[in-house]
Amino acid sequence: LTAALALVVPVATAARADSRRAADAVEAQVDATTAVLGNAVVSRAWSLAGGSVRTTALTGAGRQWVTAPGDDFALDLDGVPTTSTTGWTLLSVTPGSDSLLFRYSLAATVTAPAGIELDRRVVLRPGSSVFETTSTLVDNGPAPARVSSYTLDQVTTTALLPAQAQAYNGGSDWRDDYRHVTNEAAAFDDEGEVLRVGGDAGLFLVSQRRGGAMSRVGRDASGRTYVGVDWARDAFDFGPLQSSPPSYNRLDNPAYPVPVRARVLRPLSSIDLGTAYLGVYSGGADEAAAAFTRDFAGAVEPSYAHSVDINTFHPWGHGGGMSDANLRPQVLAAKALGVETFMLDDQWQGGAGGESGDWRWDPARFPGAEADDRPDFVDYMRQQGMQLGLWMSPLEFNMASQTYAAHPDWACAPVGDVTAQDPDDAGLSVWDATNPAFQDYLLGVVDRLVADDDVAEFKFDFMARVDCADHDYADYEDAFVSMVRRMQQRHPHVTFELDETNDQRAWPFESAAIGPSWFDNGHLHGSTAVAKLLHDVWSAAPWVPPATIGLGVYDGTLTGPYSGAAGVDALFPLAMLTHATFWTDLTTLSADQRAETAWWIAWYRAHRDQFGPAVYELTGADPLDGQSWAAWQPWNGGSGYVFAFRQAGGPDTDSLRLHGVDTDRTYAVSDVRTGARLGVYRGSQLAAGLPVSVPAYGARVLSVQPLGSR
């Protein structure tokens, strides 16, 4: 203890003079025994006595949530449990304008590896009720270390508060269950990325790591409430090689708690353990997700273009229609509707020196690139004012790739060729994403495509995680995410979309922190096509911003009860809640359908910045049944919209309780398509229930705007 005090007091004392009061109302203070990070909404305090760090207070939403000082984190290193009070020595706490950086050194013992450091940066933004904590483990020494489990953040609060855990998975190609909700009353440890604790007021924890058995949320008998990772629960990811229920491509560790997997911290390297969000809320349980998404969408999620896109995969796929001559009429039709980005899916690349892995234009499909590496089709799109999007499988290559022939050492060994032998897969082999030379090459490919072809959006597909020699697939995942972030830094105005139609890629929050997610290829498992699209949005909202979900617009849906212009009025409002992407031959739309679609696109482009960041879920039933209503409320501070959808069943009129309204203000509610005003309501009336009428197989978009001052 004396040695620990000798180490921590000098740096903490020096930091006392470095306290910063930001003009934007975030305050970070540090002295010899305490650290505080707060704003006008929320505050968190830590004790630093003796080099041990404990969270002593979490104040917000009208109360104090910490019931006893508690460890800030737990981490199992080489089989030895450690916490912020055991096994580590605090080196320093450094205040920033909106943050505190805690630096720890692993305490020296006979068995502990030397030179291990843990850095935890806690960020609080102006007006936010959410603390964002990012943990990085650094090995400055000569020996590796194994990390089998850890918490990303934790606090001790009332042990008997009601709790709700939510676990997410992608994989719409094989399954429909993307969100799993578990209500808990006592101690528990569940798979999950979201944990809400409390009733009308409470706290929440969210993990930015992807879904999987290793992602954990829980609470012990003392009230220690946490979000973290337990790698020992995970065994293997089959990727596209296994798609059968109930486990699909997951293989949990059958020997747990005996570990099969752990993260390996290599000498002179670091591991990004992940980011967690701890926040407080009040005003009802629905306000928890609203508080999170306001912070996440405003600061973490990149400000990519929420453009209206078309993607060529449906209906042309890999066929002859995927060509310059066939697609020019689609460009003209898209331009007339107001579509902004034209994305060429798989098969724009090809030919000698152009296959997947080489990433050059197929001269048979898109001629003209022989001279300047830019096909005539790209010039034609520029002339029409259309942006270009390109599909890529950045981590996989065709066996005919000349790049692979020149650099076979870039392939993932020993499993790099396995998927190429699978008749159910795309016949692609796998690069080693952790290879620095390959990383530089792929970054160069993206640089070239942006420079030569003005690519505005990439869709990255086939991101199976694999073990490569001495790197496991968690290393592989982190290497890929790191590459995409480097691409974003180089090209901040380019959108990077990840395909999440297979499970265990990056969904939900790791993917959303990068950009939109292509979520659904239209594979049905007993439901109608429209019901599945509604279900996709229902599964994401309210915690995952639905604007990040990419779905096929008019993909076999403008038929039957959704035919004609009325079908457009029922379907395009759903597209506006998502990353709107047409999957259809636009030249087949009738004149009435084209006119109605163009009206909605123009309205969306004029108002899309008003959708959110919070999106409340107004109906509880899963619309996958094809009968239930589904309704959402995008809300941007004091105003927003109601999107209501009715399928085959349900009443003609439903009462939808709105959230986020000021009960003492007056609001005008209007139909955005007709311009008709439904009425003027007090906020208290809207909170009690707004009556909304929708015909069967129909939709309605209502504007909710405040009138005058409060």
Model-derived segments and their meaning:
Residues 41, 135, 268, 381, ...:
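Conserved, mostly hydrophobic/aromatic
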Residues 41, 306-444, 451-460, 466:
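Aromatic-lined carbohydrate-binding/catalytic grooves of carbohydrate-active enzymes
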Residues 41, 213-217, 622-663, 701-703:
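Carbohydrate-binding surface patches
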Residues 20-38, 42, 54-238, 666, ...:
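Polysaccharide-binding surfaces and accessory modules of carbohydrate-active proteins
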Residues 679-710:
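C-terminal beta-strand-rich structural cap/linker in extracellular carbohydrate-active enzymes
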Residues 1-17:
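Secretory targeting and sorting signals
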Residues 405-440, 444, 482-588:
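Glycan-recognition surfaces
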Residues 263-282, 642, 696-705:
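Short Pro-Gly-centered flexible turn/kink motifs
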